[in-house]
Amino acid sequence: MKNKIVSSAPSIGISFGAGGARGIAHLLMIEALDDLGLKPSIISGSSIGAVVGAFYAAGFSAKEMREILNQLINPKSDSVFDFLLKSDIVKLFTMFDPQFIKSGFIKGEKFQSYMKSHLPVSRFEELKIPLKIVATDYWKKEEVIFDKGDLINPIKASYSLPGLFTPVKIKNRILIDGGAVNPLPYDLLKNDCHITIAIDVTAVKMQSENEIPPTFDSVFTTYQTMQNSIINERLKFLKPDIYIRPEIYDVRVFDFVKADLIFKQAQPAKEELKRKLEVLLNKS
């Protein structure tokens, strides 16, 4: 086993990207840092990355977050997350307070309550690690960055997929999913650390490329294609010090029940992150 990196190493910033269930892979990237005895000095997140980033910034280890995930997808008793045992998207809607209204199918108040009950903090200032969360101003079509004040509502805004979740109103701004403008917000880290890490969990090709996709799949895949384009264009002009993209196949936006498959497929990316970090830190 390799020696842990000394605490005098340069400061690290890590960005957790959007990607739905594939965001489970973020936990392996946190494990990579844990294995090396490292903690970031700054975190940024968009959509599912904002959720993971909040728990990490609040002090949860990768192991603790895995335990929470296991409770959610393998509940021993009935819970609001029982939908995860089913593939039927209608069950998912039920869990998230479905309301067939013009602003979106899902209110998301149950999940918001879950966040409030499990996160030990409710404000950015109470986090152990500084965190920046990205959402999108629907009407102004611009990025909104949160790093102070209330924590829970910005998280909800950041994962509010347009047309599915109802938008979130914060200070007279109507906000939707951060992935619409910045699905991998590593650019927010560059002035706050020596080494920037970007974890991209946007979709790669599906195996069933010749099939006509179901309605929801086609909508989400189109949205993810847009996210891929945003990230690829940004990488041309501003590169993080370490860019990691786990090769996760056949995992759709709400395939949280495929956690074991995601962990298996993302394992090589975890080892890649460790190797790249060791190289950079040993040069310092």
Where are these regions (language model features)?
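Patatin-like phospholipase
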Residues: M1-S46, A54-S284
